[in-house]
Amino acid sequence: MLRFDGLAASRAAVADMMDSLRHRGPDSDGLHVDGPAGLGHLRLKIIDLSPAAAQPMTNEDGSLWITFNGEIYNYRSLRATLMGAGHPFRSASDTEAILHLYEEVGDRVVEELDGMFAFALWDRRRERMLLARDRVGKKPLYYHKDDRRLLFGSEPKALLRHPGLAPEVDDRGVAAYFTYGYAPAPRSLYRDVEVVPPGHVVSYSVDGNEERRRYWDLRFPDAADVGRPDERSAEARVRALLTEAVKKRLVADVPLGAFLSGGVDSSIVVGLMSQLTSEPVRTFSIGFAGDPAFDETRYARMVSE
């Protein structure tokens, strides 16, 4: 939350918004209010299970606060670089790497992150709230802005818990959902609730001024510049990319598993996981009893065994 009217953020309002999202973070919770800014976090522990990694998290002097959802796959290399530049770390979390990286490069922090993420970062010195979302929008981030306040959260229900926002359906958002299977950003299913688009940062100052920037877009090179690789080279390239993608996602301080449908995609992922780890891979599957046309559990069982 960020107030534009000179009033302090309401701790009770932030806490009420958090209560609607407790299913997302069962391990711990935290809340911080700093004048017009209020941040809440419900944590699902993945990296650094200690209290040192609790959120909202701040830097050394309390001038920056962040609530972050996701995983940063290159946080170890970022951490090493930042420590070499003199930044002290109090945790082993990827969250803290974002804070110190922001101290170094400001808004360009998102361009250095390899991962899936959505975060809100309060910069007290600049009196500004920064909302950011990963390149393809794997992690959600909804927000509402009016003349008095900015509200944001991982699900619309958090925003709708605030008494200043009425739950009204957006007809265009619903029409888009039934047309495409989702409501394209920045539209949502609710009126006056928007989505931070993938690959974007949106910031608001305490006077309500908005700045919006696209930091990444999917660009396809011309076919003439790429050429036509032979089948063996293409296969090797795809295998290398998939292996690296799976490998970077195996960094965790908790046991890992995979949803195994029995289809090609999940079977490849589980196969690569088994090659990259020494421990047996835990898999989970869902079947369709009595409907053999859609039931692939037999294939899932073959892969898991």
Can you say where each PLM-predicted feature lies in the sequence?
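Cysteine-centered catalytic environments shared across enzyme families
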Residues: 1-305
